[in-house]
Amino acid sequence: MSGRRRAYPQPQYATGPAEMATPPAPNQFQQQQPVQQPVQQYGVDQMQGQFQQMNVGGVGPTGVPPAPQYSYQQPGQPQQSPQLSYDPYQPQPQANTGVYGQGMGGVPPSAVPAGGAGYGGYGQQNNIGLGAQLNALYTTDLSRDLPPPIAELSFQPPPITLPDNATLIPASKTANATPEYFRSTLNVVPTNSSLLKKSKLPLAIVVNPYNALKIENENVPVTCDTVISRCRRCRGYINPFVTLAENGRRWRCNFCNLLNDIPSAFDYDEISGQVKNKFDRVELNHSVVEFIAPKEYMARAPQPIVYTFIIDVSVHAIQSGLTGTITRTILESLDRIPNENKTARVSFIGVDSNLHYIRFNEGLEGTEILVVADIDEPFLPSPGGLLVNLDENREAIEKLLLDFPSYFENNANQGFALGPALKAGHKMISNIGGKLVCFAATLPNIGEGKLSVRDEASVAGKAKEAKALLAPADSFYKSFAVTCNSSQVTVDLFLTSSAYQDVATLSNLARYTAGQTHFYPAWTSNKYEDVAKLSKEVSDHLSQDIALEAVLRVRGSTGFRMSSFYGNFFNRSSDLCSFPTFPRDQSYLIEMSIEETINKPVVYFQAAVLHSTCFGERRIRVMNLALPTSSKLVDIYASADQLAIANYFTHKAIEKALSSSLPEAREYLIARVVDILNVYRKELVAGNVSGASPLQISTNLRMLPLLLFCLTKHLAFRGERVPSDHRAAALNNLGSSPIPQLIKSIYPTVYSLHNMPDTCGLPGVKEDEDDEEGAGAEIDVVLPDPINDSKASWENYGLYLIDNGSELFLWVSGNVVPGLVQDLFGTENLYEIPTGKTELPEFSLEESEFNYRVRQIIGKIREQNDSIIWKNLYVVVGASSNEPIEISQQRDLMALRMWASSCLVEDKTGSEPSYRDFLTSLKSKVSQ
């Protein structure tokens, strides 16, 4: 094995799938012409002159630049980064023109419009008054956008362009929320409901109040006092978009237009005791801010963080190793539980057919187990000692967790009374609130909430599958969850079993209490990778800086109504979402309706989360979003956010699947693509020429058909037979994932490793855009650029890494170069490679640079501060013509190949068509 950098020879193939990946002809994108607008006075000739003046390369004679070529891999060359390369989910600096800015589209209004060095669809043309210009619309043909330019999946939404005087602080860079926190499906809002209906586009907002598991990984400003100014009528919070009146003594609400008094303490600094400039206050400068709440926002003192651990101790849990793994993980995570003010409390209940309470003797190291056999009417066997302070009882808790598995090591009880255990845990903490964290390896089979195995074989693949297998089998779990919500109690589930667990029913516990259901099929402690994944995710789950006893309310300008809410919470009233605890790794979607004609050039939305921090402080996190309006369909389409729209349609498809059937959910998604293409063809294609391609769409929406097509092939919706627990878990994940994770789940990321640039897998300098000297900042591992999810972009001798958001697949092609196998695995024999769930051997940089770089890439992908998911690695060896017969007949390897291949969503899989075939079928549907 050599430490030198090896250049792996690439065999030349005269024919093969890889030939399909050739780039398009240079004139392929000449159809990208701006949509003609009769009222527009900003002509193409004028645009051409400005482009030439700016000396932007690649501008054609018509003034419209060709489509960017970086989305396609050139023959013999590794795929390169887009010209504007940045992390799409990190906050970006905004332009100084009142516009959402470079972080939201790559170019300010004065720079290159669609198809140039920025995003292939955003130029500013339409004047909405007061100096603001909306995005111009450029058309592309989906049938010629093959392979699809997937780099655009990592681009920011279209820029939000506002009048120069839209903010109280002129040219504020931080007044409008970034999409990491608050984004709309439409960055230009229709002025009336008929226009919205005509567009066939949804109007909804995506709220992600927290985008990191730990507070220190966020940069949200906090007010330095408890002065909060709110509108007397609509109760909106003062924000960067209000206007001042009467020499700054009053402010006009940007939601309902009411004049309100500014508090006398608004320009007084309590810390220094000095008068301060009110314009320096964070709530007037920042779109996302946290207020420290005064006492009137508290119904009681902020609650401490409370965890009740409900642990399966039945024979299945003992034999699989779940009980021992969980208690050891909790023990190792005690220091990670947020406990800054030493008020955290914990309790433990072991569950088989009985309830095993753990009582701590105050001040003593010993504990005792109190067994309650009456599961019909569960009760607390002791008035005290069950729920104890973590800090004060640390030694006893540590000893309990060390000894806990031995208490049940010979247990042969096959019962699992989850329902009674939940009721007991709720009774224990209902007067305080907190979390019930359940670890189960067994289907609840005794007591209230008893479940039985459903007959999957008789309904799998049929229209009634969803109602028979995905509907809750027992109403107890939803009704109990609603009770928990009113008591400020969240339920989280960690389900580990190779047998049926009825995830569809149990997940109601988490859905209505703002929790989450984590599913680990075929988990066993005999597999190191299984233990590592469960332990890592449980530990990160316990370490989250969760918010407590929280509510979320979203407000909008006059004329808007919040009509539907999606996510894991419970609607306490028509517009108030209740969260006993607020997780930091989930997202929420609110659909809006337009109730009256909007006559203002800008409308506003505000989301507020009233909560208690895990260190005992009552706060309100407020997020603000301002959007321009338009009465023109062209403006609506030019500023549509395709990723947010995909998120919306995902929620609607989940709703359709659970209320109707899986086939209807798939048909719904395809019908939405057809609707949008029909509207675009009839209303927005220049001249509406008969015989024009039916697959024309705006460049900023050209990934939407791909995403919705791939969604129909997702585990949650696909027509093939899928175990109901797996399907239910997939539906849960889709319904709560933030947009970055959602998109990766729908369209997995594939990296080509055998031909990656020399810089990949090694530390590089991540540019700091705020550093004027360009010295750079954070040292980070460089990742390869993704390639399309299709075998057409693969080589028969390649090495590929697939990231589907939940797992990683390392695909070693059957004709791989032996030297690559040697450098990566330490053997030249391809069939000596350990396949399946495993880890790569660890070689130092000197021993094998290639092995080191690949492991660094995998480590970087796994490294995330916004999710608890730990991605297991599966090594897959592809088929080859000289493969030994005994290898070809291995069922596990065949299943693994099929699983990994299902991530190549652009290809034909089973009965599902390829993306190319899908587009062909769309032509007839759109032309009808």
From Swiss-Prot:
Listed SUPFAM superfamilies: beta-sandwich domain of Sec23/24, C-terminal, gelsolin-like domain of Sec23/24, Helical domain of Sec23/24, vWA-like, Zn-finger domain of Sec23/24
Protein name (Swiss-Prot/TrEMBL): Protein transport protein SEC24
GO MF: SNARE binding; zinc ion binding
Biased composition range(s): Low complexity: 27-48, 69-86
Signal peptide residues on this chain, from the entry's feature table: none
Pfam families per record: Gelsolin (PF00626), Sec23_BS (PF08033), Sec23_helical (PF04815), Sec23_trunk (PF04811), zf-Sec23_Sec24 (PF04810)
Keywords associated with the record: Cytoplasm, Cytoplasmic vesicle, Endoplasmic reticulum, ER-Golgi transport, Golgi apparatus, Membrane, Metal-binding, Protein transport, Transport, Zinc
Protein residues bound to Zn(2+): 231, 234, 253, 256
Keyword Endoplasmic reticulum: yes
Family according to the record: Belongs to the SEC23/SEC24 family. SEC24 subfamily.
Origin superkingdom: Eukaryota
Membrane topology term: Peripheral membrane protein
InterPro entries, per database record: ADF-H/Gelsolin-like_dom_sf, Gelsolin-like_dom, Gelsolin-like_dom_sf, Sec23/24_helical_dom, Sec23/24_helical_dom_sf, Sec23/24_trunk_dom, Sec23_24_beta_S, SEC23_SEC24_subfamily
Record text on subunit structure and interactions: The COPII coat is composed of at least 5 proteins: the SEC23/24 complex, the SEC13/31 complex, and the protein SAR1. Golgi apparatus membrane; Peripheral membrane protein; Cytoplasmic side.
The keyword Chloroplast is assigned to this record: no
Subcellular location: Cytoplasm; Cytoplasmic vesicle, COPII-coated vesicle membrane; Endoplasmic reticulum membrane; Golgi apparatus membrane
Classification via Gene3D superfamilies: beta-sandwich domain of Sec23/24, Sec23/Sec24 helical domain, Severin, von Willebrand factor, type A domain, Zn-finger domain of Sec23/24
Positions of region (Disordered): 1-104
Segments of this protein annotated with the region Zinc finger-like: 231-256
GO CC terms of this entry: cis-Golgi network; COPII vesicle coat; endoplasmic reticulum exit site; endoplasmic reticulum membrane; equatorial cell cortex; Golgi membrane
Record's function text: Component of the coat protein complex II (COPII) which promotes the formation of transport vesicles from the endoplasmic reticulum (ER). The coat has two main functions, the physical deformation of the endoplasmic reticulum membrane into vesicles and the selection of cargo molecules.
Any one GO biological process: intracellular protein transport
